[in-house]
Amino acid sequence: MSESRRCWYIYLIRCGDGSLYTGITTDVSRRLAEHRDTDGKGKGAKSLRGKQPLTIAFSTTVGSRSAALKIEYAIKQLGKAGKEALLSQQLDLDTLKSLSQSDE
């Protein structure tokens, strides 16, 4: 499948220390496994090292890579309280899209 036709996901990982990490991927299960991998191969995010256990707090499809990047950026601009508020409302896709378009 070509890069442009893949289905992209936005995901939030809850770390063992309670922090939240936001990312995008085409395969959430694979990406979580990469983040959890502690054998030093370097495929997980450096910011997650030492923050085990890692669990998926949220994930949803967002369509294109471009849309995923915009939504990821919008979520990363929120503080922890904002991310928690989004999670408590179950982060509906319309909310995410409006967040990503608010900077345009």
Residue ranges, per PLM feature:
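A short, polar/charged loop-to-alpha-helix boundary motif
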Residues: 81-88
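Conserved C-terminal helical docking segment of ANL/AMP-forming enzymes
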Residues: 45
